[in-house]
A protein has these predicted regions:
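Hydrophobic helical h-region of N-terminal Sec-dependent signal peptides
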Residues: 15, 19-20
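Phenylalanine-focused residue identity feature
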Residues: 5, 68-70, 122, 175, ...
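Bacterial N-terminal signal peptides that target proteins for export
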Residues: 2-14
Length: 265
């Protein structure tokens, strides 16, 4: 095969280097936010990483007249957490472009860039399923108060719950698969597995990994989770000795899908 690099002139190489420097220098994040929540003015908010036992601060700013802004150089595209004090408020994808954040009593929204728009759309869809799931309990209580046949009611609600859980699995699995090769895939994977007491291999995880890309499989957090889950399965089947591997190094403050689906206070 012909080595095309040898055909490049010194001028071509210089132009390429200049272009790379220009692109790198233009890569930055710019977050413009607003909030009308009481007690927010004058307080400091932070952007923090999601890796490590102690999340590291990336940026901080004060809220002035309900407005705040972060901006800086972008080393890599990643999901970070917007925090006030030690409370996580919402995830944000730190990526190139102008990111718009709104925090109010009705909604929490982040958009303006491709990955943030995608994450917000996923969160909204998940929230709709969570609300439908909550309605099942309300329907059950209402049926009991109305003196309905609870055996029939519970059968009907169990079927509805199963259908919603199937939709939830499909929504989460499809979103992760669509984002295997960016930061959203691993992030949502761990949101979905936060409810597990320990790493396990569920049918949806096994199905997901059969089509996962190498980039996703080799993500350090994904790889550590899968190794721990496989070890746990081997222990349960008697293949391995009881020796629990370390849990994946993921902070406990990451909101789960259920957390994100809760109505804002």
């Amino acid at each position: 095969m012909k080595n095309n690099f040898t055909t490049l002139s010194i001028a071509d190489v210089c132009l390429a280097i200049i272009a790379m420097v220009t692109i790198t220098s233009c890569t930055k994040y710019d977050i413009i936010g607003s909030s009308d929540l009481q007690g927010v003015d004058g307080r400091m908010i932070y952007l923090r990483t999601l890796t490590g036992e102690t999340p590291q601060g990336i940026d901080s700013c004060d809220v002035v007249h309900g407005k705040f802004r972060f901006s800086g150089a972008l080393d890599s595209v990643q999901v970070v957490m917007l925090c006030m004090d030690n409370n996580a408020m919402m995830p944000i994808v730190l990526e190139d472009g102008k990111i718009k954040v709104e925090i109010n009593a009705q909604k929490i929204m982040c958009g303006g860039t491709p990955l943030n728009d995608s994450l917000t759309s996923f969160t909204n869809n998940y929230r709709q399923l969570a609300m439908q799931m909550a309605d099942l309990e309300h329907t059950q209580n209402q049926a009991y108060m109305n003196g309905e046949d609870m055996d029939e009611v519970n059968k009907r609600l169990a079927l509805a719950e199963r259908e919603l859980l199937i939709k939830e699995d499909k929504l989460v699995s499809r979103f992760i698969a669509d984002n295997f090769d960016n930061c959203l895939g691993p992030y949502v994977f761990f949101m979905a597995t936060q409810a597990y007491e320990y790493p396990i291999l569920t049918p949806w995880i096994e199905a997901l990994m059969t089509k996962a890309t190498d980039a996703f499989k080799n993500n350090p957090i994904i790889k550590e989770y899968m190794e721990a889950a496989q070890h746990n399965q081997d222990v349960m089947t008697g293949v391995a000795d009881v020796q629990q591997p370390a849990m994946p190094d993921v902070p406990t403050h990451v909101p789960t899908p259920n957390d994100m689906a809760k109505p804002e206070k």
